[in-house]
């Protein structure tokens, strides 16, 4: 059987895209996924352009693959993702042995591209933005464990001054609500218990309904939570300026929506936020968190931070540290600023020394780690509901799973617990994990109800006396 290898860099959207590529090429060409690139007949590199020197990293990887192509002339090499979208034809200028260059919105065309290359075409570059077409061309979802990612939209319209996403993934396009619900219901039938809704800015979701109406993100959350078998709902990533009160109301009355939120602020200084074109202040961000904690007192918050943005003063950084303490973030993805070509911020003078940037990043991460450990220690002696993912990586005789607030818990259990929920009493707290004992199995919780995907769609559609279809969100 012919084999496929995909090297994936970057965000969860890229991970999701790579899984779809693998499923697609397995269904169309029978390609079997391998983690050994030297065995592959098709090599795909799914790239990310967020970090500094992303392009050089791509060409370095391609240089290693070039040698394999010399020994294996029929080997097909493709480059996708955000660097491909940015660079386009320039990739082949520097690496003419690359056969296919495709963007995040054209991965569904891979089967046709491969056929053309095998048919004698020299090379194909397709980095267009055909809106939502790719989701209509992908195979049915295939569950791999009790958790799954589902893309609900693509692109971003916010144009933050440091970010390449609007240029590499295009503007915001939402999937129709029926398509999203049907995919999740199919996954639930396969045993998925937790779904993570993906998008560059999920709270901008505006999905078309079957009758031409619009479903908001808050309404979508309620509909997803109503699917039997889905007992946890997460999402990533969201933007503060569209974190509206109707979303906060979902936290008030939808227990399936986890008490853990990733809401990036990037900086705690209003002056820096203005230069970043974030279009909100630190006070407005804190107001959202205050409202959330009024309806979910135990919710834990994570964020992204960019340290050393051009023009960030020592006082600006201290304001960020103050916000970190005030919000009491549980976790963060923190980076030293690096200019991305083509973004407005790339034209700003990079006036902060590398030494100063590293010192600020170390202070920020130390503070967040301290707060995270305080949250973990507070869990000692409590009961936590854990979704069991499989054997522990450290000890195959033990099981591992995650709490609602994203903590890894290791414990002694039986194989029949995998894919189900258990209640664990936390007995030990470590830097990167927790440990505990099982106090309750899922059989004692009465959680799971099996329901077909088609019936979920039927339940979300109702017709009035005149036969006009409408959605009923509060099921």
Curated annotation (Swiss-Prot):
Q: Which UniProt keywords apply?
A: 4Fe-4S, Cytoplasm, Iron, Iron-sulfur, Metal-binding, S-adenosyl-L-methionine, Transferase, tRNA processing
SUPFAM superfamilies membership: Radical SAM enzymes
Which CDD domains does the UniProt entry name for this protein?
Answer: Radical_SAM
Localization, per the record, is:
Cytoplasm
* Primary localization class, coarse: cytoplasm
Radical SAM core domain location is: 142-374
Q: Name one GO cellular component term.
A: cytosol
Tell me which residues bind [4Fe-4S] cluster 1: 11, 48, 82
Q: Where does [4Fe-4S] cluster 2 bind?
A: 156, 160, 163
In its keyword annotation, does this UniProt entry include S-adenosyl-L-methionine? yes
What cofactor does this chain's UniProt record say it requires?
[4Fe-4S] cluster
Family classification: Belongs to the methylthiotransferase family. MiaB subfamily.
Summarize subunit and interaction data from the UniProt record for this chain: Monomer.
Fetch the HAMAP family from UniProt. Answer: tRNA_metthiotr_MiaB
Any idea what this protein is called? tRNA-2-methylthio-N(6)-dimethylallyladenosine synthase
Annotated gene? miaB
């Amino acid at each position: 059987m012919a084999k496929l290898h995909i090297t994936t860099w970057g965000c969860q959207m890229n991970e999701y895209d790579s899984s779809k590529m693998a499923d697609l090429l397995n269904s169309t060409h029978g390609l079997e996924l391998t983690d050994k690139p030297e065995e592959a007949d098709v090599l795909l590199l799914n790239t990310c352009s967020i970090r500094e020197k992303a392009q050089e990293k791509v060409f370095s990887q391609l240089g290693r693959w070039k040698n394999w192509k010399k020994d294996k002339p029929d080997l097909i090499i493709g480059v996708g993702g955000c660097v491909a979208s940015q660079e386009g034809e320039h990739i082949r200028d520097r690496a003419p042995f690359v056969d296919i260059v495709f963007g995040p919105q054209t991965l569904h065309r891979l089967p046709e591209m491969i056929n053309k290359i095998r048919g004698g075409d020299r090379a194909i570059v397709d980095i267009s933005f055909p809106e939502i077409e790719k989701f209509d061309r992908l195979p049915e979802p295939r569950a791999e464990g009790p958790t799954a990612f589902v893309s609900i939209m693509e692109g971003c319209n916010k144009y933050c001054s440091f970010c390449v996403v609007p240029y590499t993934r295009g503007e915001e396009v939402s999937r129709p609500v029926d398509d999203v619900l049907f995919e999740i219901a199919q996954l639930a039938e396969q045993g998925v218990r937790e779904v993570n809704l993906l998008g560059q800015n999920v709270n901008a979701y505006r999905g078309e309904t079957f009758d031409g109406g619009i479903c908001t993100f808050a309404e979508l959350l309620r509909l997803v939570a109503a699917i039997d078998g889905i007992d946890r709902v997460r999402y990533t990533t969201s933007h503060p300026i569209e974190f509206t009160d109707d979303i906060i109301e979902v936290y008030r009355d939808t227990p399936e929506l986890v008490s853990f939120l990733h809401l990036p602020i990037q900086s705690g200084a209003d002056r820096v936020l203005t230069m970043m074109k974030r279009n909100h202040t630190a006070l407005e961000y804190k107001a959202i968190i205050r409202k959330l904690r009024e309806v979910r007192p135990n919710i834990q918050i994570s964020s992204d931070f960019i340290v050393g943005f051009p023009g960030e003063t020592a006082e600006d950084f201290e304001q960020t540290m103050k916000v970190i303490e005030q919000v009491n973030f549980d976790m963060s993805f923190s980076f030293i600023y690096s200019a991305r070509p083509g973004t407005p911020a790339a034209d700003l003078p990079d006036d902060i020394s590398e030494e100063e940037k590293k010192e600020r990043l170390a202070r920020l991460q130390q503070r967040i780690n301290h707060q995270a450990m305080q949250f973990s220690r507070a869990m000692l002696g409590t009961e936590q509901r854990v979704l069991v993912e499989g054997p522990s990586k450290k000890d195959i005789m033990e099981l591992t799973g995650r709490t609602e607030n994203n903590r890894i818990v290791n414990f002694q259990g039986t194989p029949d617990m995998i894919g189900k929920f258990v209640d664990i009493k936390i007995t030990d707290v470590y830097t990167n994990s927790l440990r505990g004992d099982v106090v309750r199995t899922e059989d004692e919780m009465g959680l799971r109800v099996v329901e077909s995907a088609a019936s979920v769609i039927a339940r979300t559609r109702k017709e009035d006396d005149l036969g006009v279809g409408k959605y009923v969100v509060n099921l």
